[in-house]
Amino acid sequence: KVRTRGRGSLQVTDTIQQHVARSGITQGLCHLFLHHTSASLVLCENADPDVRTDMERYMLRLVPDGDSLFEHVSEGPDDMPAHIRSLLTHTDLTLPVGDGHCSLGTWQGVYLWEHRQQGHRRQITVTVTGV
């Protein structure tokens, strides 16, 4: 379980790497599944936070809160846009495991991207398979 602080990205790489290490799997795959439809899992640059700021700005322009096209408005003006943003990104990721950890590129990090304005408790299932 991960607690978000509202709209934006939260790096979860270290938590995922700890799960993989505890699994005892040295070679295989790590599958991540987010149990929600208004947030995403993304593999993104982890060195320059401006990258994630730019992604957020672009997504807000692409799918603005309170768009008059949306009929689903009962949960607030940010809910339906959050569902669409989730569809445009990912709610699951599969990563290679080598030497007992996720084999990520130098500048890659795993992020939970919250699309709602308020913070939420989010659940990620981590499944590690291999040898």
Task: Place the predicted regions along the sequence by residue.
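Active-site histidine-anchored catalytic micro-motif
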Residues: 1-131
